[in-house]
């Protein structure tokens, strides 16, 4: 399987700042959100998952550092099963091929001697305190609440610290004992004789993860992970002016960490449920208003029911033209950061009747004569 380039997925350079990565992520999830791509939803869902995966790695300094160094995050590189070998060090591919005919043992040992066991380093990290994973959730926010802001209760599943063992993964009272495989050293050393001589293979003990100790008895509640899955509820504040695709970070509300590591964060992706009477462009609101041709000539007043429930009376000046825009300043959506409101824009649509009554037609002909217009006299 080809290795994914997370920088390419987000469209940022390898030295991009966290803010640049965050901005790129926000733009891409807006573009590829499945609910905004009904015609190619399957492709959008795949893209959306790729974007989330890339952001999860590049937004975490520890994961990003590992990805930059090795080309992957986790114990096993993406192409480990395909014979690609040293995934993060393409320049050594030819050197690895020289030894591949000697068997897996010699091949692995040679690389361990010269470059160390990369997989070991990732295992050691897992035994140290590690921050919990972030959680992403999408919530629907009614368009009306964009004006005032709101607080939304959210329930979701997350991993929390096991209360029985206090996150240790060990049954209380049993403690830790010396690892029988590495005898408490955290390192396993093997010597093998080959036609090249004695080759020493040293690697981190995979039974204790390099700590030299194992649980005397594994916690029966969490199975040794130190975490248990629970239903969690949190109140999330949605600020006024929030837009579709906005991501709100709630610190410390993600999954519990490992071995005393802190909680990850909760990322709330906002999806605005539409309003059929208004169109939003930035912080401006646009609404089409139909008026009679007589109202267009003489001027009129219209009452607009705003999304927040208020009724706004707007004066339409005499002589307004079809397609003209009437601006009502400061009646749009509030800016999420400054609080300053956009404008309400009324697009005028003048309704010209196809048929009029006899009396109305007679009056119109009189007006036409006053204006010196030659009109059809036929009934």
Swiss-Prot record:
- Keyword Cytoplasm carried by entry: yes
What are its GO cellular component terms?
cytoplasm
Provenance organism: Thermosipho africanus (strain TCF52B)
Cofactor binding summary note: Binds 2 Zn(2+) ions per monomer.
User: What's in the domain note?
Assistant: The J domain is necessary and sufficient to stimulate DnaK ATPase activity. Zinc center 1 plays an important role in the autonomous, DnaK-independent chaperone activity of DnaJ. Zinc center 2 is essential for interaction with DnaK and for DnaJ activity.
Q: Which residues cross the membrane?
A: none
What's the protein called, per UniProt? Chaperone protein DnaJ
Q: Please state every residue range assigned to the domain named J.
A: 5-71
Q: Which GO terms describe its biological process?
A: chaperone cofactor-dependent protein refolding; DNA replication; protein refolding; response to heat
């Amino acid at each position: 399987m080809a290795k994914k380039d997370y920088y390419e997925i987000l469209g940022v350079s390898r030295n991009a700042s966290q803010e640049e990565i965050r901005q790129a992520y926000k733009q891409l999830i807006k573009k590829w959100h499945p609910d905004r791509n009904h015609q190619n939803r399957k492709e959008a869902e795949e893209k959306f998952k790729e974007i989330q995966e890339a952001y999860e790695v590049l937004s975490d300094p520890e994961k990003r550092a590992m990805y930059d160094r090795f080309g992957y995050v986790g114990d096993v590189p993406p192409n480990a099963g395909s014979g690609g070998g040293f995934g993060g060090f393409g320049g050594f591919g030819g050197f690895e091929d020289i030894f591949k005919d000697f068997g897996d043992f010699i091949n692995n040992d040679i690389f361990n001697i010269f470059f160390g066991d990369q997989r070991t380093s990732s295992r050691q990290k897992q035994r140290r305190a590690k921050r919990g994973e972030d959680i992403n959730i999408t919530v629907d926010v009614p368009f009306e609440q964009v004006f005032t802001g709101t607080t939304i209760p959210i329930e979701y599943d997350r991993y929390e610290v096991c209360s029985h063992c206090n996150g240790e993964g060990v049954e209380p009272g049993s403690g830790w004992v010396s690892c029988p495989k590495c005898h408490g050293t955290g390192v396993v050393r093997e010597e093998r004789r080959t036609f090249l001589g004695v080759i020493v293979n040293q690697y981190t003990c995979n039974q204790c993860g390099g700590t030299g100790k194992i649980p005397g008895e594994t916690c029966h509640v969490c199975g040794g992970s130190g975490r248990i899955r629970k239903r969690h509820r949190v109140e999330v504040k949605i600020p006024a002016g929030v837009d579709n695709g906005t991501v709100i970070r709630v610190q410390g509300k993600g999954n519990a960490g490992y071995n005393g590591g802190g909680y990850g964060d909760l990322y709330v992706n906002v999806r605005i449920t539409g309003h059929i009477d208004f169109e939003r462009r930035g912080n401006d609101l646009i609404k089409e208003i139909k008026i009679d041709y007589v109202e267009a000539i003489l001027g009129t007043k219209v009452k607009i029911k705003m999304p927040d429930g208020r009724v706004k009376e707007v004066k339409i000046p005499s002589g307004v033209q079809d397609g003209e825009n009437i601006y009502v300043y400061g009646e749009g959506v509030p800016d999420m950061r400054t609080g300053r409101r956009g404008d309400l824009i009324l697009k005028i649509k003048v309704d010209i009747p196809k048929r009029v009554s006899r009396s109305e037609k007679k009056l119109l002909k009189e007006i036409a004569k006053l204006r010196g217009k030659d009109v059809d006299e036929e009934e």
